[in-house]
Amino acid sequence: MATLETRLAEMLTPAVEAAGYVVWGIEYVQAGKHSILRVYIDSEQGISVDDCADASRQISAILDVEDPISNEYTLEVSSPGLDRPLFNAAQYARYVGEDVKVQLTMPVEGSRNLKGVIDKVEGQMLTIKVDGKTLVVALDNIRKGNIIAKF
């Protein structure tokens, strides 16, 4: 069975793309009685506050009709930002050579939190260099991954 995020992506992507944006990723965070639905959008030109407001109106209209979430939630639409979250193999592959931090579901080498450099992505496996060690992590073992912004 598809996850809620997958179903939401299938539902929202056509309208978001028709408006000129790309759905970078979707997070649904349950926080007691009130949850948060985060939709990250991107485009070649970057994303402005007006773009987020425009996409939010489009997304809200779809969610009001389809009603895929039964409990109360807040919709947040934003750009992925400098420390952008990574959601799939293509996104990790796009940032080969960049610093990344990942939170794992199951520990690798005794750790659930890794910081390192993305070495390569093959299929659904991420190779990351952490403190001189090369580690291979299954993408489905990554709970959360983010680029580490360089200033």
Curated annotation (Swiss-Prot):
Q: Where in the cell is it found?
A: Cytoplasm
One biological process term from GO is: translation
Question: What are the annotated GO cellular component locations?
Answer: cytosol
Superkingdom of the source species = Bacteria
Supply the Pfam families for this chain: DUF150_C, RimP_N
Q: Which InterPro entries match?
A: Ribosome_maturation_RimP, RimP_C, RimP_C_sf, RimP_N, RimP_N_sf
Task: From the UniProt record, list the coiled-coil ranges.
Answer: none
Q: Where is the signal peptide?
A: none
Q: Which UniProt keywords apply?
A: Cytoplasm, Ribosome biogenesis
What HAMAP family does this protein's entry cite? Answer: RimP
Say which family it is in: Belongs to the RimP family.
* Protein role: Required for maturation of 30S ribosomal subunits.
User: Which NCBIfam families does the annotation name?
Assistant: PRK00092.1-1 (NF000927)
- This chain's protein is named Ribosome maturation factor RimP
Q: Which organism is it from?
A: Shewanella amazonensis (strain ATCC BAA-1098 / SB2B)
* Name of the encoding gene: rimP
